[in-house]
Structure formats: structure tokens, C-alpha cells
Regions:
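A conserved beta-strand element that flanks and buttresses the S-adenosyl-L-methionine
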Residues: 116
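Conserved class I S-adenosyl-L-methionine
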Residues: 1-43, 46-55
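A short, conserved alpha-helix within the catalytic core of class I
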Residues: 123-135
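Conserved Class I S-adenosyl-L-methionine
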Residues: 56, 171-233
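Class I SAM-dependent methyltransferase SAM/SAH-binding core
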Residues: 56-103
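Short conserved loop adjoining the S-adenosyl-L-methionine
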Residues: 103-110
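Conserved beta-strand signature within the Rossmann-like core of class I S-adenosyl-L-methionine
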Residues: 140-148
Length: 233
């Protein structure tokens, strides 16, 4: 997702109209491939896992498939509908919770083997660092956070209380978007920004598109970090 829309994406209502664009991006994207590989190598069945801001279940579903018991926390009704649709045949072992991360008391979160959040903590009303602190305060055995680095607010502690970082990786990940037409790229820009582009902006959008096969592609990438902490007694 483009940096320009992170603040707009912090409201569940944003996703009511954005879900089709998210689905289209996911259909052609390999953004999560490395993330899934790492998280499924860390987790062990039958771990209890909480996925904060689960979206369409891109991380929850592989964990359920390997035998974990997953609570998918997703406050957007549109994204929950998508999650239920895509997890229709993989629901055993998954519980979908409509609450926001801010709405849950830490005392209700005891007993998790892993709490994970992928590009979701900065979308909370309390902000990235307080949301991360709340994960540690919930006392899971392990914490995994995936985040893009687009703001000075995104700061990653090596230690927090009795948690120590056990794994860290930062890499450039392709996040390109495929469109069926150049006009569709302009529509997507409008969905991102909440306004229609001017003539020069429209021309600039179209000038960045490259034709490959049946699609017009907008090249993009993101600096993505994956961090894992483990609790030590």
C-alpha cells in the first residue's frame, strides 16, 4: 500500500470501498510470500496465535492449515467479509474477532503462544509504539511484528521488559500493482487519495505505467522489517 494513504487507512470505514483494490493487489502480489515462510517456520502447532489486523487472513490461514489455533482480529466489516469468504474451507481452528486492538483488555489475552501484527499497529488509534507496548504487556510467549518503514514513529526496540529480540530482517519487497487499463490506475489513485487527479497528475500516473502481458503495471517496492521477540524468565 502506498505511503500516502496510511492515515486514511487507519479508519475501518476506509476499507469499505478499498477492498476490491486490495483483492486486485493480492491477486498478483508476492508481497507476503517471504513473510509467510518465516512465520510458519517460527510457529508450531498447536500454538494459540492472535493475528492483529488479520485482513483477508493472508497470515492466519497458513497458520490454521499447519495446525495452530488462530484468533483473527479484524475491526473492518468489509475485510471480515473477505476473510470469511477466503477462509470458507479453512475455518476449523480459526476464530474471527471484530474488535479493535485498542478495545481488548490485556487481562483477556493471557495464554497466547504468539501475537503477531503485519502492517497493522500504525493503523490503531493509539499509534505504533503504544500498540506494540500493549502486545508486550499481554505477555505472549513470542511476538512477531511486520512493518514498513515510512514514518519516524516506526521504532523497533531490541528489548522490552523480559522480551528479547530473537530474529530480525529488513529487506526491500516488491509491491507493484497490475491494472487492466490505464484508466483503472487513475481510479485507484483516486481511491488512495480521496480526490480526483488534475490533468497533469493524471498524465503523470499514466506515464509511470508499463505494459506487460495483459496488464499495465505500476512499479513499487517497500522497505519491510520482520521482527520476532521471545519472552525470557
Amino acid at each position: 500500500m502506498e505511503q500516502s494513504i496510511w492515515k486514511r487507512a487507519a479508519t475501518p470505514s476506509f476499507w469499505q470501498g478499498y477492498v476490491p483494490w486490495y483483492q486486485q493487489w493480492m491477486a498478483y502480489s508476492h508481497y507476503h510470500d517471504g513473510i509467510i515462510k518465516t512465520i510458519t517456520s517460527i510457529a508450531r502447532p498447536p500454538w494459540r496465535v492472535l493475528d492483529i489486523g488479520a485482513g483477508n487472513g493472508v497470515l492466519s490461514r497458513p497458520l490454521v492449515q499447519m495446525g495452530c489455533e488462530v484468533t483473527a482480529l479484524e475491526p473492518s466489516s468489509a475485510m471480515r467479509d473477505l476473510l470469511e469468504q477466503e477462509a470458507a474451507y479453512q475455518c476449523d481452528g480459526m476464530h474471527i474477532d471484530e474488535r479493535s486492538w485498542e478495545a481488548i483488555r490485556c487481562e483477556a489475552l493471557c495464554g497466547y503462544d504468539l501475537i503477531l501484527a503485519c502492517n497493522s499497529l500504525h493503523l490503531t488509534q493509539i499509534g505504533f509504539l503504544p500498540a506494540l507496548a500493549k502486545i508486550f504487556a499481554s505477555e505472549p510467549k513470542r511476538v512477531v511484528v511486520v512493518t514498513e518503514f515510512f514514518s519516524s514513529e516506526i521504532r523497533i526496540p531490541v528489548r522490552s521488559g523480559n522480551y528479547r529480540m530473537a530474529y530480525a530482517r529488513i529487506e526491500e519487497v516488491e509491491s507493484s500493482y497490475g491494472y487492466h487499463s490505464r484508466d483503472e490506475a487513475v481510479e485507484h489513485w483516486s481511491a488512495n487519495t480521496g480526490r480526483h487527479p488534475g490533468l497533469w497528475e493524471k498524465a503523470e500516473i499514466k506515464s509511470k505505467l508499463v505494459r506487460r502481458g495483459d496488464h499495465w503495471w505500476m512499479a513499487d517496492s517497500a522497505l519491510v522489517g520482520l521482527f520476532c521477540w521471545k519472552a525470557f524468565q
